[in-house]
Swiss-Prot record:
Species of origin: Mus musculus (Mouse)
The protein's name: Pre-mRNA-splicing factor 38A
Region described as Disordered: 181-312
Biased composition (Acidic residues): 184-202
Bias type Basic and acidic residues, positions: 203-224
Length: 312
């Protein structure tokens, strides 16, 4: 019969590999048109050609519970049980993303916990878009890494109940699995290393060359000049410069024009001159009058004699 498992197939998780799919869904697959026409007589080599024709992933859809081609090929692979190397090549295939998804689902169903973490976790770095068909027959966009995350953390994918998977930290404590390093951490390490290299280059650029050190060399045995002497010299030189400056400088014509044109300065100067002349004139007249009226004793005697003669 076409629905029987291969005689040389090994039991998986203590049971027939086809029994990993529920009986109701399995009978629907056997009755489907795609299974009868496309999956009859397929071998491990021919499954690859059918997997390359896949356009979406999904389980069953519609009221009649119709299986998708992706689910039919999954059951066919459980039936013929291809070798592990073929499944690994399915997962490593980067050209056909649905071939990769088919191999990942089969590895999750049949592989050990160590194999699942080893071969499926690298697919977290695949961010390509894929189409998924839900129960209503509608297509939904999702990414490869989302599908892989569901395989490792969900209980049911594509309407298939997944076997129990041992926790990762348990395998790490038992030293059966190394800690996972994400691509983001690797990028951060690269960025940090590049920043450190740039800082080292900047430090090397800041270090002065030996020629520069020779130029800036100073004899430490010679005493330094005190800042007070410098200050005194600067003060002693400043008056000379100030005394020389007015001799050298010539009055600018702009200042003369400004003085001649400004009426306020002219008025103030004329007032100062008048005030000075007034202040000087009373003293001068008083001294003159005092000299004219003040007579010597000889003159006073002569005038007294003349007055007597006139009276006589």
């Amino acid at each position: 019969m076409a629905n029987r498992t291969v005689k040389d197939a090994h039991s998986i998780h203590g049971t027939n590999p086809q029994y990993l799919v529920e009986k109701i869904i399995r009978t629907r697959i056997y009755e489907s048109k795609y299974w009868k026409e496309e999956c009859f007589g397929l071998t491990a080599e021919l499954v690859v050609d059918k997997a390359m024709e896949l356009k979406f992933v999904g389980g069953v859809y519609g009221g009649n519970i119709k299986p998708t081609p992706f689910l039919c090929l999954t059951l066919k692979m459980l039936q013929i049980q291809p070798e592990k190397d073929i499944i690994v090549e399915f997962i490593k295939n980067e050209d056909f993303k649905y071939v990769r998804m088919l191999g990942a689902l089969y590895m999750r169903l049949t592989g050990t916990a160590i194999d699942c973490y080893k071969y499926l976790e690298p697919l977290y770095n695949d961010y390509r878009k894929i189409k998924s068909q839900n129960r209503n027959g509608e297509f939904v966009l999702m990414h490869v890494d989302e599908f892989i995350y569901e395989l490792l953390h969900s209980e049911r994918v594509c309407d298939i109940i997944l076997p129990r998977l041992q926790k990762r930290y348990v395998l790490e404590e038992a030293e059966q699995l190394e800690p996972r390093v994400s691509a983001l951490e690797e990028d951060m390490d690269d960025v940090e290393s590049s920043e450190e290299e740039e800082e080292e280059d900047e430090k090397l650029e800041r270090v002065p060359s030996p020629d520069h050190r020779r130029r800036s060399y100073r004899d430490l045995d010679k005493p330094r000049r005190s800042p007070a002497l410098r200050y005194r010299r600067s003060r002693s030189r400043s008056p000379r410069r100030r005394s020389r400056s007015p001799k050298r400088r010539s009055p600018s014509p702009r200042r003369e024009r400004h003085r001649s044109k400004s009426p306020r300065r002219h008025r103030s100067r004329s007032r100062d001159r008048r005030h000075r002349s007034r202040s000087k004139s009373p003293g001068h007249h008083r001294s003159h009058r005092h000299r004219s009226h003040s007579k010597s004793p000889e003159r006073s005697k002569k005038s007294h004699k003349k007055s007597r003669r006139g009276n006589e």
